[in-house]
Amino acid sequence: MGYLLTIACYIASFSPSIALFCSFIAHDPVRIILFFLGSFFWLVSLLFSSLAWLGLSTVLPDTFLLSLTVCIIAQELSRVAYFMLLKKAQRGLNKITRQGQISVAPGVSDLHNARHMLALVCGLGMGVISALFYTMNAFAIFSGPGTIGLPNALKTGEIDTNRAGKYLPLCYTLSAILLTLFHVTWTIMVWDSCHKIGRIPSAFVPGAAAVVSHLLVTFLSSLNSRGFHVLVFAVQFLILLICIAYCNVIMGGTISSFVNGIGQSITDAVTLKQVRTLIEERKLRTQRQSVPDEPMTERAGTSNTVNA
């Protein structure tokens, strides 16, 4: 039962990431490389955060909040460093594909001026590796005899990590989904600031919004151990909607188009549009493959007449 629970948690946690990967990344080799490179940059930021935490723990008695802040700043700086690297490598990427011409490398799309798509790809790479590191220790415990909680931590710690009870796997799964999508929005906002810096006075606003929302979401997550799971997820989901709407505006959309898109998605989900579309396509495919009986009868009658 423990292994089945772990597999179900992994599938649910990374299903949105898999959907985005298959829709926007899987068909392009360059985007696949950038996806994994984004994961690498997040791992580098985690390394520097670990070194900072190790150094601070030898000086200060309680370094939780300070180490958490340093970790967030390191992650945002890694996004800036990734943007600068891609900006310098843009000439090399443009040599692979020329705009309006046949690609030198088949299957590689034109990445020129595809800033927001690059941000989505790289942010998804950061989000996936972040969610994996966030969940894999807990999911490894779930794969055991089915005991939910951290027994060793319960013996030495003061916080009741077992307060969520049977809903603890669900909490980790929802947190992983939100964390992945948050990293996509934060990357879009930070890269928009990096692109517009020095061009407009308000270029710092998207980057500041990313840092503030990152801090807020992270500190809200620390309240999960105190039993405020429903409240934390509700606030985080609201913040995610605001971040997605802001990214939609950054990419040239409007709030009304964002609201209409959500309404249409809900309508399609309720009416099972995808299922109905698949059924209709299968019916059409079956009708095209089937051979009608009347022409065969007519041919048979014609042949009998000729023989007579």
Swiss-Prot record:
GO cellular component assignments: endoplasmic reticulum; gamma-secretase complex
Transmembrane segments: 5-25, 32-52, 53-73, 122-142, 170-190, 200-220, 230-250
Major site of localization recorded for this protein: membrane
Gene Ontology terms, MF aspect: protein-macromolecule adaptor activity
Stored InterPro entries: Aph-1
Topology versus the membrane: Multi-pass membrane protein
Keyword annotations of the record: Membrane, Notch signaling pathway, Transmembrane, Transmembrane helix
UniProt keyword Transmembrane, yes or no: yes
Keyword Transmembrane helix: yes
Region of interest called Disordered, as start-end residue ranges on this chain: 286-308
Compartments, record wording: Membrane
Record-level GO BP terms: cell fate commitment; cell fate commitment involved in pattern specification; embryo development ending in birth or egg hatching; embryonic morphogenesis; nematode pharynx development; Notch receptor processing; Notch signaling pathway; oocyte development
Family stated for the protein in its record: Belongs to the APH-1 family.
Function text: Essential subunit of the gamma-secretase complex, an endoprotease complex that catalyzes the intramembrane cleavage of integral proteins such as Notch receptors (lin-12 or glp-1). It may represent a stabilizing cofactor for the presenilin homodimer that promotes the formation of a stable complex. Required for the localization of aph-2.
Subunit annotation: Component of the gamma-secretase complex, a complex probably composed of the presenilin homodimer (sel-12, hop-1 or spe-4), nicastrin (aph-2), aph-1 and pen-2.
Protein name: Gamma-secretase subunit aph-1
